[in-house]
Amino acid sequence: APKGPSLFEVQDMIENSSKPIISAIHGTALGGGLEVALTCHYRIAVPSARCGLPEVKLGLLPGAGGTQRLPRIVGAQKALQMVTSGEHIPAKECLEIGLIDEIASEDSLLEDAIKFASVIVKENKPLVKVKENEENIKEDKGNHALFTAFRKSIARRTRGFLAPEYNIQCIEAAVNKPFEEGIKVERDLFTKLVTGSQSA
C-alpha cells in the first residue's frame, strides 16, 4: 500500500506553500499540534485556546521542529521557559509573546481565519517562513550567559532528569546554528530520549 507523507514532509509543504496557510486554533494546540501550527505562515486562535510543548513532562522534547521554530517566534528566554516547564499558555499571552497573530471570536473562528487570510492576500503581506526568521534570536547568538543562568534557575527542579537539559541544548542550537543543523541536534537528542530509560 502507498505510504502517506511523513509529518516532516507535510510541514515542508505547509511552509513552502505559495498560498497563505493560517493555523486556526481552538481547544489546545499542544506538542505536535503546535509544531504543525508553527510551520504555518500565520496563527489565529479563539480566546479559550491554549498552546504549549508539554513533551518534557513525558521525559521527551518536541521532535518535529518545535525547539527550532519556537525561539524564532518568541525569543530564546520564553522558548526556554515553555519547553522546560511544558506549561499551557492561554491565547491572550500567546498573542502578547507573538506566538499567535490574532485572537478570533470564540464562535466564528473559521470566518475570522478566512477574513484574516483575505487581508493577507489583499495587502500582499509576506508568507512568513518561521525557519528563516532570525530576528527574534539574533541578539542571543553567542550569549552563553543566558543559557548558564537559565540552567541555574531550574537546576533544583530538574536535577537528575535528561529531558530539561536536552530541551535547553536544542534551544541553544536554534539560537546558534543554522536551522537545518539545529533540526539535526533536535532529532539526535529526541532519539536519545525516546530510546532511553526516562521517557514515559
Description of each model-found segment:
Residues 1-26, 66-68, 73, 199-200:
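An acidic, glycine-rich surface segment that forms the CoA-thioester-binding/catalytic face
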Residues 70, 78-87:
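Short helix- or helix-capping micro-motifs
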Residues 14-58, 62:
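Glycine-rich beta-to-alpha active-site loop
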Residues 191-200:
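Long amphipathic alpha-helix in the N-terminal Rossmann-like dinucleotide-binding domain
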Residues 4, 8, 31, 88:
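Glycine-rich phosphate-binding loop at the start of an alpha helix
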